[in-house]
């Protein structure tokens, strides 16, 4: 029995079946499944009545994958169910004037997007042709869908900002430098810890003779395994910068600030060490030692993306867009009295106050591109968020989007968090490109979902 049906613009019929599952069993068994299967698991390890709740989401064996690099946008059917789904989506993508077919077969559709041929006004830049053009076409196809969870789930790389803030790139890029990596799942498991309920939402897609009904889920290709799963790491940690080299770049950035080129730039270093255990163990360790609003484990077959973040990037529901800039950090004390002293010191820190003010000013400016005048509001100022080892001071900002703008506009207009780039943002990311030695890849980007309903949660 179908619990919900929707017909898309071109006639794709989506049927959803809702199945209640045992709440006590939970859905974290999917974490172990992700050692060997494509998919994702996202959870919130903290609860805040205004912003965060203790949800868990997961899916495995998605039928369709989207991977974008600088010069191409690839859709891949990952299992037999993905083949008819890819065939349904192909015509609606190819009819877009800015999308061109590069190559195709039954399981792959490789596209290119035309580069902008004109200048766009500040308020229109999120609409210029880009990697998000095919994603917009998909969102337009399913516009009006009343479903909380169906959409594109995955990761968005730092390099996406160079499509919005176009500038010369000085570092070479490789196949590992993705702009985004997304999945379209067809079975999503959701657990609401507050209401103590759990559901599996299962989707079937049909368009004329094409259908996913009765199709198998076995993946066409497997997941890469660690070469020596039982070998222990020696613990050596390496970096792409020596301490002296990094401090030299920091001194150079200070000089740029002194002469007035920028207010702030956030330079990064990449650290790496060998790890030969299952990725699920790493994710569970991170959940245990650093409970966060955004805990994530993406299995991308040739790489795994695991993390825990305290910061909401952009969230959109209807015309409401919100974000939570973070700046100001203090280490937790050994007891309640020490905690109170450190919170007081954090509140009295002029440096932390002005830095958060700057971050929020940039955030409000980002919103002004797409929001109605007078609707951008500060909902919380220097609120204290408590985590396992740290306190953060956080602002909470919302705005109401103007007619004609959507969640993708909100997402693009905010790329990326000032706390990981700098201000003015365009100048800061140019300096990052010029002086860092490794592309940031996923660092400084975002994870989350773009729902077909128009909701964004990143």
Regions found by a protein language model. Name each.
Residues 1-458:
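Extended alpha-helical targeting/anchoring segments
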């Amino acid at each position: 029995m179908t619990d919900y049906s929707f017909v898309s613009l071109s006639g794709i019929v989506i049927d959803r079946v809702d199945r209640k599952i045992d709440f006590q069993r939970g859905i974290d068994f999917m974490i172990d499944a992700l050692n060997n299967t494509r998919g994702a698991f996202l959870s919130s390890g903290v609860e805040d009545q205004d912003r965060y709740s203790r949800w868990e989401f997961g899916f495995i064996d998605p039928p369709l994958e989207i991977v974008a690099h600088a010069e191409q946008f690839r859709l891949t059917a990952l299992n037999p169910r993905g083949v008819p789904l890819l065939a349904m989506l192909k015509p609606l993508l190819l009819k877009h004037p800015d999308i061109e077919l590069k190559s195709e077969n039954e399981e792959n559709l490789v596209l290119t997007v035309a580069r902008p041929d004109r200048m766009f006004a500040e308020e229109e830049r999120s609409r210029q042709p880009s990697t998000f053009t095919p994603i917009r076409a998909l969102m337009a196809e399913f516009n009006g869908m009343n479903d909380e969870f169906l959409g594109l789930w995955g990761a968005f790389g730092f390099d996406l900002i160079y499509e919005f803030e176009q500038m010369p790139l000085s570092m070479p890029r490789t196949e590992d430098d993705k702009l985004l990596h997304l999945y379209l799942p067809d079975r999503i498991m959701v657990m609401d810890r507050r209401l103590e309920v759990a559901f599996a939402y299962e989707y079937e897609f049909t368009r004329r003779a094409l259908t996913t009904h009765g199709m198998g889920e076995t993946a066409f290709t497997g997941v890469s395994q660690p070469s020596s799963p039982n070998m222990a790491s020696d613990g050596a940690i390496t970096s792409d910068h020596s301490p002296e080299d990094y401090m030299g770049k920091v001194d150079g950035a200070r000089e740029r600030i002194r002469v007035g080129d920028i207010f702030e730039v956030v330079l990064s270093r990449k650290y790496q060490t060998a790890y030969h255990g299952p990725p699920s163990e790493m994710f569970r360790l991170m959940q245990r030692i650093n409970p966060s609003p955004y805990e994530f484990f993406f299995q991308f077959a040739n790489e795994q993306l695991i993390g825990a973040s305290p910061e909401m990037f952009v969230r959109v529901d209807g015309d409401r867009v919100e974000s939570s800039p973070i700046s100001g950090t203090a280490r937790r004390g050994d007891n309640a009295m020490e905690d109170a002293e450190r919170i007081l010191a954090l509140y009295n820190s002029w440096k932390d106050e002005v830095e958060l003010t700057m971050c929020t000013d940039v955030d409000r400016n980002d919103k002004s591109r797409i929001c109605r005048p007078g609707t951008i509001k500060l909902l919380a100022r220097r609120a204290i968020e408590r985590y396992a080892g740290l306190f953060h001071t956080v602002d909470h900002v919302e705005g109401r989007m103007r007619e004609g703008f959507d969640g993708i506009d909100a997402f693009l207009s905010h790329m990326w968090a000032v706390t990981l780039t700098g201000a003015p943002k365009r100048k800061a990311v140019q300096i990052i490109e010029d002086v860092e030695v490794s592309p940031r890849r996923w660092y400084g980007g975002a994870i989350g979902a773009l729902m077909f309903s128009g909701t964004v949660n990143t």
